């Protein structure tokens, strides 16, 4: 959806050069479009092929020419075609009508569900909120997921990096967060698929429908809007689709005054697309071939994701690390903006511990006594040190067995195993697979539960009672059930 001003204000230019996804357009003297304006080209080429594409102005070249980047394929585009300056940046639909729908970078629905029932649109380029409008007091965003809330709590209006390979539960974790923010916080979510596989986008959409996150029968009951610019799209679309998703999220925050979750999968592809566009525009590459404007590009997106006095956008961003090199400029620049990292470990998934969040590798700037309080901080650190000691003892156990450990170490191992099991939790969105009802665990219950394990109050309960339950009351009930079954 591109801004279409009144005919009198439209300036018409002519396409003079096409180089892949980049085109040069000549305009009348004194009537050049502004940088970031959308240009619309609708024409028939000599072969009779209908051309309809939108491009975004990136450079003013001189000689009344501008250079623009196309948001869709330029196949069939020829010199001499008319390009119209829309007089405004690309705009996308916003509001409740976007929920349950799938959009492309231009805000056009691509789910074959008909037009979007809203006239409200917003430009994808805008300034970050003013400092005076920001909520500066750090506030923990409760997710209801024990391992996250205790060991790597999210900041409301913060940015979280989600790291994990294939098949360790990223999608299910994302679905559970979307479900929990809708039920417990009355918030909505926006999912931005940036440069990932089309198949994954389709699978995600089908899984959302299956788990009830998208209500196919009544879209107004859906909890998420989706915005996709997949791997096969030109770099312009992949570079801007993150902003399209962010613009939809900003409307829910600023106009509806809601708490919003924004998912970006994958933030690395956003940087990668910017690098491609930069090269096409003829800019001199910087370190490792990235664009010289890397810091600015990432900053423009990240600084708009924040908590204001009216509402918040909490962002969870999947981060692909090229060749597992954390010093690569793309992930290194992204890390500078993150408040927390959630690392999913294959070893935990292999043990059947879900969510497979690594309790020792996941971090958060919120885990400090001045923010979460002394009790939460001490409990989290005690849990981590117990798990760390268990990790150190595993080599000895593998070689000599448990019997060779000291009494104290055996107790540590016993408690660590219970902690590891208690960090697992049944999810609402996985009910159809597990047959177990999902659990949302309040932070106070989480802290109390882990304190009881650490203090030794539950040493007599079997390890299995701690697996895939919510709070400690459920552990005790499960222990009774296991006892009666023997």
Curated annotation (Swiss-Prot):
It comes from the Bacteria. One of its GO terms (molecular function) is ATP binding. Its EC number is 7.1.2.2. Keywords: ATP synthesis, ATP-binding, CF(1), Hydrogen ion transport, Ion transport, Membrane, Nucleotide-binding, Thylakoid, Translocase, Transport. It is a peripheral membrane protein. It catalyses: ATP + H2O + 4 H(+)(in) = ADP + phosphate + 5 H(+)(out). PROSITE patterns: ATPASE_ALPHA_BETA. The keyword Methyltransferase does not apply. ATP binds at residues 164-171. F-type ATPases have 2 components, CF(1) - the catalytic core - and CF(0) - the membrane proton channel. CF(1) has five subunits: alpha(3), beta(3), gamma(1), delta(1), epsilon(1). CF(0) has four main subunits: a(1), b(1), b'(1) and c(9-12). Produces ATP from ADP in the presence of a proton gradient across the membrane. The catalytic sites are hosted primarily by the beta subunits. This is ATP synthase subunit beta.
């Amino acid at each position: 959806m591109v801004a279409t001003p009144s005919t009198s204000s439209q300036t018409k230019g002519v396409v003079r050069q096409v180089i892949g996804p980049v085109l040069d357009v000549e305009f009348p003297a004194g009537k050049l479009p502004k940088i970031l304006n959308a240009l619309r080209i609708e024409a028939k080429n000599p072969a009779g092929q209908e051309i309809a594409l939108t491009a975004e102005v990136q450079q003013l070249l001189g000689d009344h020419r501008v250079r623009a980047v196309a948001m869709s394929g330029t196949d069939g585009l020829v010199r001499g075609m008319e390009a119209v300056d829309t007089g405004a940046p690309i705009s996308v639909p916003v509001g409740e009508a976007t929920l349950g729908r799938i959009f492309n970078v231009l805000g056009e629905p691509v789910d074959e569900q008909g037009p979007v029932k809203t006239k409200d649109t917003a430009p994808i380029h805008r300034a970050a909120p003013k400092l005076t409008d920001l909520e500066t007091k750090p506030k923990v965003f409760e997710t209801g997921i024990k391992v996250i809330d205790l060991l790597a709590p999210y900041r409301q209006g913060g940015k979280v990096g989600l790291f994990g390979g294939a098949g360790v539960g990223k999608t299910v974790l994302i679905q559970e967060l979307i479900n929990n923010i809708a039920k417990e916080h009355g918030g909505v979510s926006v999912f931005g698929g940036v440069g990932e596989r089309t198949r994954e986008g389709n699978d995600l959409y089908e899984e959302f429908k299956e788990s009830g996150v998208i209500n196919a029968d009544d879209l107004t009951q859906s909890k998420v809007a989706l915005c996709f610019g997949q791997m096969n799209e030109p770099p312009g679309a992949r570079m801007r689709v993150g902003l399209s998703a962010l613009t939809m999220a900003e409307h829910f925050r600023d106009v509806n005054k809601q708490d919003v979750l924004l998912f970006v999968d994958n933030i690395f592809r956003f940087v990668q697309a910017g690098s491609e566009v930069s090269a096409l525009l003829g800019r001199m590459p910087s370190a490792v071939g990235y664009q010289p404007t890397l810091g600015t590009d990432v900053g423009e997106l990240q600084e708009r994701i924040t908590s204001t006095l009216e509402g918040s956008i909490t962002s969870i961003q999947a981060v692909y690390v090229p060749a597992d090199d954390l010093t690569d400029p793309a992930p290194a620049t992204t890390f500078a903006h993150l408040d927390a990292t959630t690392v999913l470990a294959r070893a935990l998934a292999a043990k059947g511990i879900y969510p497979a969040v690594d309790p020792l590798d996941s971090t958060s700037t919120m885990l400090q006594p001045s923010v979460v309080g002394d009790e939460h901080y001490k409990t989290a650190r005690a849990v981590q040190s117990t798990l760390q000691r268990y990790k150190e003892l595993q080599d000895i156990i593998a070689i000599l067995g448990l019997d060779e450990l000291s009494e104290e170490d055996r107790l540590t191992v016993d408690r660590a195993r219970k902690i590891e099991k208690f960090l697992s939790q049944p999810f609402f969105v996985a009910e159809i697979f597990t047959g177990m009802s999902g659990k949302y665990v309040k932070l106070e219950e989480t802290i109390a539960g882990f304190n009881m394990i650490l203090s030794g109050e539950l040493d007599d309960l079997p390890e299995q009672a701690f697996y895939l339950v919510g709070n400690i009351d459920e552990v005790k009930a499960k222990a009774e059930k296991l006892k009666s079954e023997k």
